[in-house]
Amino acid sequence: MFPIDIDFSRLKEVFTYDPQAPMIFSSGIFLWLFAAFMVVYVLLQHKYTARILFVTLFSYYFYYKSSGTYFFLLAIVTVCDFLLAQLMYRTEGYWKRKGLVTLSLGVNLGLLAYFKYTNFLGGVIASLMGGEFTALDIFLPVGISFFTFQSLSYTIDVYRKEIQPLTSLLDYAFYVSFFPQLVAGPIVRARDFIPQIRKPLFVSQEMFGRGIFLILSGLFKKAIISDYISINFVERIFENPTLYSGVENLMGVYGYALQIYCDFSGYSDMAIGIALLLGFHFNLNFNSPYKSASITEFWRRWHISLSSWLKDYLYISLGGNRKGKIRQYLNLIITMFLGGLWHGASWNFVLWGTFHGVALAMHKIWMTITGRRKGEQSYGWRRVFGIIITFHFVCFCWIFFRNADFQNSMDMLGQIFTTFRPQLFPQLLEGYWKVFALMLLGFLLHFAPDSWENAVCRGVIRLPFAGKAVLMVALIYLVIQMKISEIQPFIYFQF
């Protein structure tokens, strides 16, 4: 008999929650668990209820590995909104229906407010009253902003009579907790996802190939580009901007613009890719946002699931563009102000959102003055100029988004405008050539024509299974070779 050596410490790691190492798609433990998950998933392909139950339980396990026992919040939101939607559907009275949807808003936003905004609001109130506030020790569950908004979209749609409520609590739990998008989006609409739940499991060759391509693309953007430039350059600049020249600070800002894009879009790519392997379709969440020639276009390309959610459930509820131009501009600013607050309970996020809201309003005013129609594209040098201006405005806003301390942001801007010495760039390039090479690669890939990406995707789809496996192994090997520390958590986990 051969001795069996079991590493029980590693086995314990699989079943326990470690707040210092939440489970993420790019971690080794997830890749191994997902492989085992797929075996069971395929075996249950013709047993609809068993398959839905299995995925739901795995999703709760996945959330437990991200936030520990706070998975009970997910259950509270699920049960409350499922029951409230049922009551709304059976209720005819306007005010009764209004009361039920208000209760749903209260449950979801109440949980969000307590866990995310208690200390922020307490500090603001204490400051206004001239007192002091001692911050409470409140844990922020991962992804609470995402699953509360996702569940709210369901109850609001039922209230508006745009969809009928589900009759199965299990199906609704599956929708709210579906692990590929649970902790960092994209925010999936009920009307798009729920009809897919009970469909026969079918993964075409194209779906499988595209899923693999998106997983590889997301892993490359996250683990190769984002993590490397963050650890080796961006973090150093943002932590101590006064120690670096204006050129270094500007390159740090460009680096962060690429880092946050590769980090968040990389997660979205992996989420969409994993969903495709499971037979589900998600809508696009990023569409080359830095190619935008206006701030309005940027928000049609950046975090599309959130921007469309804010438009449909907040901006339109405030009146949208139905109550005159001034009210429309104010609604844009309010929507983006609250959108900034959604990202975090801190003034830097509020400022970031307000900047974008004012810019959106100013762009609307400019469109009115010039007589340009909604959605009308600019071409040639005008579009190039628009892309440059929009990109640098977005970068300016990223400075305040990244820096929790306002003075740090002002120091960084001061360095850029007062100590900008381009003659230092060759020396900087010599010291950080790997970082700048990855930044150049990242921006080239971002600005490449969509047809190039589609061609590569088609190539992956046509590869035999063995070829896809070789690609996956090669990328994982590259990640291991370039890793100089533990893989960094996704930036949007904190939201």
What is each model feature region?
Residues F2-Q494:
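Membrane-embedded transmembrane alpha-helical bundles that form the catalytic cores
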